[in-house]
């Protein structure tokens, strides 16, 4: 038995005790008992996976297990869930409620790690939970500062493990968890959906069933539009795809038949698939849960943490510089048709201070610079294609078919049409955009001056390569001279719905 597994077994034995142990403060006892029992459920899943029994489950058994793992955050249960910061603070007090809610959320995040059999990360999180229990076990000596320091030290001390693992997933083709599900499962048997460990709902099941109703030639045609757009992106930009070995594939669970065909297409281009945990996913069973925990890093985000995280990220990429250099870029299948989400902003949820917002933005910028250094932008490309999901409504199938038609329009025909649009736009000094109806947009967009209009253009003719479908001409405007009002009555950005967004 290796040292990590030994630590895990010791931790699980302690969790069994905690699940039934009495502590002096009853409100904390209920919290630790509930979370400990959830950890034991994860341990049960781990055993079922390692023994091979999980693959023999019926569809009904898999559906029930998936329900048990996610039921606490379903909308109908979330109001009284300890994963809800508002309820946690009501039950445990505002001081300890928020931080214990955060700890429970991180334990819940381990579902995916368990399915991927990432025992070290699972062990670390369980050990932190046990450490915190010891503090609350002696509640007369309990100090919030001790709890906060324990969590902060844990996050900072283990940054190397977490970030190194994240980077490895993104560039290492030997991490084949999702690839194995796609390539080795019987995709006509929807039980495969439950092997990811993600929440599986009507969208994932409905999408898989609909794609299973299509012929293989129809599936191959859809996949080819996606992969050919990726290949064309390199050709049009004059970039050499032959020097690359891997492609970053991203999709929503349920699209596996298309992804399997696409992987075979990419292999013909000499590309091996990389599908990392955030590259696949399912539609959220409760977006309020996601929103409530969106800024949990406020608990520990400071200069020292950011500095350490960037050091680790840089070293992680440096250790894999050959793998990183071989990454060709992302091939993304996006989805649309989800019901609108208007979040409730809760005072109990963590929020970033202005200083932390600057630190977060600085981290993102510096991390992107590290990525750019190891996966140079002038050597990579991408493609994005989107499809509706069953949540779109009763006419989902009609919309899916219409989307396919739009995604497969004749590029040669529309290249001529879009070039004529560009020829006219290139004659302009600026473009005036005026909103229709209730839209208040009235903006002049300044264009770059062309020194040689016969050979130069301000606009990109987008023809179903990096952005699918075609039908777009775009430019980068001159900021000086661009002025007016840009108004959007309704827009979705990062899972959130914004109303009457206006920039002056």
Where are these regions (language model features)?
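Long, well-ordered mid-to-C-terminal structural blocks that present hydrophobic/aromatic surfaces
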Residues: 478-504
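Active-site bordering "gate/hinge" segments
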Residues: 1-483, 493
